């Protein structure tokens, strides 16, 4: 399931992902607001899990809460799950991420997460955030890239690490079935190269969230073209923003 925080609650309006396996579900990211009165994520997830279990009854079903990366607009509602039974929350720090997912050779190597009959590949993705992880769902072919790649402003904090991440993703896509590339925001308009200003709370002219491995190749070319530059550089479906 794909969820999105309402822009009337927080302008970042991040996307969140809830994936169901036979033994447990994965909630990927918890959004930009902590207060359940304004952003009742726990209540929403509990309802969705209960509805899924009505259709697929089984005892002892667990929930794992993890993150594409540790920026505040992706971890704010972690606390809503602190007292939830049969629930584990993976902290957003690098040590926590590598230990939880067996990524001891970071940033090299891949990890695996088995939800029970549904396996995800985990790809180290630093560059935007030092502990960013990209998740590939083998069941659907979705590549979940967090803030590393999406139709919007790609904030690059470490260009060498980010460039290596893009290469890892391209290598992965060359040998695995990837149907769609899904990030966690939409900040572009449908006019190529034109984004909504930061803080916008109404975006009626958004493009679709989904991108493709072809867009990753375009990103690789854009990084090469701007390798010795600073600042912002708009391209068709994204804007590079160098911060290092």
Which residues are covered by each model-predicted region?
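Core dinuclear metal-dependent hydrolase active-site scaffold
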Residues: 109-137, 142
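Active-site environment of divalent metal-dependent phosphoester hydrolases
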Residues: 34-35, 70-77, 129-132, 150-154, ...
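Active-site HxH/HxHxD metal-binding segment of metal-dependent hydrolases
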Residues: 32-116
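Active-site neighborhood of phospho(di)ester-bond hydrolases with catalytic His/Asp-centered motifs
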Residues: 28-30, 58-73, 89-93, 124-127, ...
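Conserved beta-strand hairpin/beta-sheet module of binuclear metal-dependent hydrolase folds
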Residues: 1-54, 135-147
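A short alpha/beta connector and helix-capping loop motif
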Residues: 40-42, 46-48, 155-169
């Amino acid at each position: 399931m794909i969820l999105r925080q309402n822009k009337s609650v927080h302008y970042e309006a991040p996307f969140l992902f809830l994936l169901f396996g036979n033994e447990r579900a994965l909630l990927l990211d918890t959004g930009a607001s902590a207060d359940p009165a304004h952003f009742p994520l726990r209540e929403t997830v509990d309802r969705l899990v209960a509805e899924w279990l009505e259709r697929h009854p089984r005892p002892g079903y667990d929930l794992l809460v993890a993150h594409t990366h540790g920026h505040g607009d992706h971890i704010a509602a972690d606390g809503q799950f602190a007292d939830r039974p049969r629930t584990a929350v993976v902290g957003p720090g690098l040590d926590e991420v590598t230990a939880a997912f067996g990524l001891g050779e970071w940033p090299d190597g891949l990890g695996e997460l088995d939800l029970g009959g549904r396996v995800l590949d985990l790809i180290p993705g630093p560059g935007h955030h030092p502990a960013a992880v990209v998740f590939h769902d083998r069941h659907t072919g979705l590549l979940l890239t967090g803030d590393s790649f999406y139709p919007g402003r790609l904030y690059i904090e470490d260009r060498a690490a980010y460039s290596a991440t893009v290469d890892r993703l391209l290598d992965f896509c060359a040998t695995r079935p990837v149907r769609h590339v899904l990030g966690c925001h939409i900040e572009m308009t449908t006019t190529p190269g034109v984004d909504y200003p930061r803080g916008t709370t109404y975006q009626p002219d958004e493009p679709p969230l989904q991108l493709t491995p072809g867009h990753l190749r375009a990103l690789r070319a854009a990084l090469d073209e701007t390798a010795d530059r600073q600042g912002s550089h708009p391209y068709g479906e994204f804007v590079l923003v160098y911060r290092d």
